[in-house]
Swiss-Prot record:
The modification Phosphoserine is found at S501. One of its GO terms (molecular function) is cholate-CoA ligase activity. It comes from Homo sapiens (Human). Keywords: ATP-binding, Cell membrane, Endoplasmic reticulum, Fatty acid metabolism, Ligase, Lipid metabolism, Lipid transport, Membrane, Microsome, Nucleotide-binding, Oxidoreductase, Phosphoprotein, Transmembrane, Transmembrane helix, Transport. Its EC number is 6.2.1.7, 6.2.1.3, 6.2.1.-. It is found in: Endoplasmic reticulum membrane; Microsome; Cell membrane. One of its GO terms (cellular component) is endoplasmic reticulum. CDD domains: hsFATP2a_ACSVL_like. Residues 1-30, 77-690 are cytoplasmic. One of its GO terms (biological process) is ketone body biosynthetic process. May mediate the import of long-chain fatty acids (LCFA) by facilitating their transport across cell membranes. Also catalyzes the ATP-dependent formation of fatty acyl-CoA using LCFA and very-long-chain fatty acids (VLCFA) as substrates. Mainly functions as a bile acyl-CoA synthetase catalyzing the activation of bile acids via ATP-dependent formation of bile acid CoA thioesters which is necessary for their subsequent conjugation with glycine or taurine. This is Long-chain fatty acid transport protein 5. It catalyses: a fatty acid(in) = a fatty acid(out); cholate + ATP + CoA = choloyl-CoA + AMP + diphosphate; chenodeoxycholate + ATP + CoA = chenodeoxycholoyl-CoA + AMP + diphosphate; deoxycholate + ATP + CoA = deoxycholoyl-CoA + AMP + diphosphate.
Length: 690
């Protein structure tokens, strides 16, 4: 008899006792004694209680209750069910989630709605002189809640004057203002200013160039693009395409060096800083778009994932949910075009009233110095970041800091243990989720290596399935009836999250088919709909989930999602390459997978490592650049003419297995050089820098 059946029988037994008017506490006492003390001790105590019954008199329960207690002992297992010991933590976390959900829905149901902007304005009025943002590095400085609010109001009035009525700016489909920023504070002012007007904003990766950047701008549906002046070259490369689509472009400066591009600096300086009426946001609902964050996904070029006002508020509460308070100082080196840096970090501090320290980029030599200088108590991470910190030489002051909490995702168990052993008992708050996904997981009890914890109670609120999958097709396997096949405990399975009213999937801005590709139907029964995360997880008996792999055409390197389609598109522009197949391969001691490309040369052409190096450096960000090239005579394809990757991924760049010519990216030589056995050994040992 399974545990579920045993629990059902026990529940019926308790209901029967309650119906007969008998106490049920003897059953609970008997089970507790058995689980805590074991069978022998429990039997001795119950036997003594029966022998002492004549002297205990009225305190002894009725015979029916005693009989029920004895029956309960035979029904349930001798040991406590594995997940039951986490029941108090599960209940507390579920209560917090429900409370936050009801509070957020209530705020957005008001008229005008109470959005994240309203929460920020309340903080600015309550503590105008408190430092909100502190930035490090060249030009270090800070801005208070009051100062940022005033500058955001100036941005709102300047944009309203420059672009017209916000109602027309956001008419029809949600129209975003795009921010292509390399400097945090001016971009944040523009974002908050547009939010005060009720308009969503799209944040674009400033490292993009050429076709991927143009695609990102055009796919947003935005009519306005605001650019930092130091990204002039990137803008001018795509400006003709933007002008053909009547997209207005502005620099965040007082002058414009580019014909056809305006400058907002003077208008921002001249704009008033008085409050923006909340009535301008009256049309917002909990379903309204608040942000567009670009994600590589698994189906091609970057797509603008829609973050609704409800979703933004939920994500911004993660710091509060982890136990952070207004007294904390949060440190982040994560980019603002990512959810973790912008929503969890910046908005989380806006919500809490805490101070956020922004570093321009990650530096192992500056990380702990910054933390000590600014009294940092909370750090945000991706798994790769903490591994880099563990790899630097040990210092006497490694534990001389005030950091008590680290929040992020993608932390491996070995790095988790090493990090805490070296830098002290810092509590790890590991979370899991995707920008466009409809469900997240939180490791709220701190189990090392787990990306999240799922109780039976929480699963009723956020249903999901782990199912068998076809690695090559990157899709679920179905049984004879056409339904997906669940995996057992401890077995790797593709994570599918159910789309229900309290867990909707909003998807991407653009054609509906972009979002439909992420949905799987008829998973457990006819008519149900699930979101395909593309991630392979395994769940143990206690409800902890562990990451196993990532399916599809995306892999993760240096904390960034890399779209193989995007990289293939860039490489295909090289004249001596006829066909390109990009994939990620594992490197010993490194998080994620590094990019590798199997290529077929065009007829009569030879491989030019220097030319390829110059091309990828010009058109791809560093994290998306393939580090290994494999030259094949012919590409393997499936019956539907899809390029096959499984064998290529398995063989990787192992010179002892691969017979095809292999090349490695050499930054010193500024070329792709033939990969030798010595170079391969250096990569595996970590002495060759990737």
């Amino acid at each position: 008899m399974g545990v579920r059946q045993q629990l059902a029988l026990l529940l019926l037994l308790l209901l029967l006792l309650w119906g007969l008017g008998q106490p049920v506490w003897p059953v609970a006492v008997a089970l507790t004694l058995r689980w805590l003390l074991g069978d022998p001790t429990c039997c001795v105590l119950l036997g003594l209680a029966m022998l002492a019954r004549p002297w205990l008199g009225p305190w002894v329960p009725h015979g029916l209750s005693l009989a029920a207690a004895a029956l309960a002992l035979t029904l349930l297992p001798a040991r406590l069910p594995p997940g039951l010991r986490w029941l108090p933590a599960d209940v507390i976390f579920l209560a917090k989630i429900l409370h936050l959900g009801l509070k957020i829905r209530g705020c957005l149901s008001r008229q005008p709605p109470d959005t994240f902007v309203d929460a920020f304005e309340r903080r600015a009025r309550a503590q105008p002189g408190r430092a909100l943002l502190v930035w490090t590095g060249p030009g270090a400085g800070s801005v208070t809640f009051g100062e940022l609010d005033a500058r955001a109001c100036q941005a709102a009035w300047a944009l309203k004057a420059e672009l017209g009525d916000p109602a027309s700016l956001c008419a029809g489909e949600p129209t975003a203002l795009l921010v292509l920023a390399s400097q945090a504070v001016p971009a944040l002012c523009m974002w908050l200013g547009l939010a005060k007007l009720g308009c969503p904003t799209a944040w674009i990766n400033p490292h993009g160039r050429g076709m991927p950047l143009a695609h990102s701008v055009l796919s947003s549906g935005a009519r306005v693009l605001v650019v930092d002046p130091d990204l002039r070259e990137s803008l001018e490369e795509i400006l003709p395409k933007l002008q053909a689509e009547n997209i207005r472009c502005f620099y965040l400066s007082h002058t414009s060096p580019t014909p056809g591009v305006g400058a907002l600096g003077a208008a921002l300086d001249a704009a008033p800083s008085h409050p923006v009426p909340a009535d301008l946001r009256a049309g917002i609902t909990w379903r309204s778009p608040a942000l567009f964050i670009y994600t590589s996904g698994t189906t091609g070029l970057p797509k603008p994932a829609i973050l609704t006002h409800e979703r933004v508020l939920q994500m911004s509460k993660m710091l509060s949910l982890s136990g952070a308070t207004a007294d904390d100082v949060v440190y982040t080196v994560l980019p603002l075009y990512h959810v973790m840096g912008l929503v969890v970090g910046i908005l989380g501090c806006l919500d809490l009233g805490a101070t956020c320290v922004l570093a321009p980029k990650f530096s192992t030599s500056c990380f702990w110095d910054d933390c000590r200088q600014h009294g940092v108590t909370v750090i945000l991470y991706v798994g790769e970041l903490l591994r880099y910190l563990c790899n630097i030489p040990q210092q006497p002051e490694d534990r001389t800091h005030t950091v008590r909490l680290a929040m992020g995702n993608g932390l491996r168990a070995d790095v988790w243990e090493t990090f805490q052993q070296r830098f002290g008992p810092i509590r790890i708050w590991e979370v899991y989720g995707s920008t466009e996904g409809n469900m997240g997981l939180v490791n709220y009890v701190g189990r090392c290596g787990a990306l999240g914890k799922m109780s039976c109670l929480l699963r009723m609120l956020s249903p999901f399935e782990l199912v068998q999958f076809d690695m090559e097709a990157a899709e679920p396997v179905r049984d004879n009836q056409g339904f997906c096949i669940p995996v057992g405990l401890g077995e790797p399975g593709l994570l599918l999250t159910k789309v229900v009213s309290q867990q909707p999937f909003v998807g991407y801005r653009g054609p509906r088919e972009l979002s439909e590709r992420k949905l799987v139907r008829n998973v457990r029964q006819s008519g149900d709909v699930y979101y395909n995360t593309g991630d392979v997880l395994a769940m143990d008996r206690e409800g902890f989930l562990y990451f196993r792999d990532r399916l599809g055409d995306t892999f993760r390197w240096k904390g960034e999602n890399v779209s193989t389609h995007e990289v293939e598109g860039v490489l295909s522009q090289v004249d001596f390459l006829q066909q390109v197949n990009v994939y990620g391969v594992c490197v010993p001691g490194c998080e994620g997978k590094v990019g590798m490309a199997a290529v077929q040369l065009a007829p009569g052409q030879t491989f030019d490592g220097e030319k390829l190096y110059q091309h990828v450096r010009a058109w791809l960000p560093a994290y998306a650049t393939p580090h290994f090239i494999r030259i094949q005579d012919a590409m393997e394809v499936t019956s539907t003419f899809k390029l096959m990757k499984t064998r290529l991924v398995r063989e990787g760049f192992n010179v002892g297995i691969v017979v095809d010519p292999l090349f490695v990216l050499d930054n010193r030589a500024q070329s792709f050089r033939p990969l030798t056995a010595e170079m391969y050994q250096a990569v595996c040992e970590g002495t060759w820098r990737l």
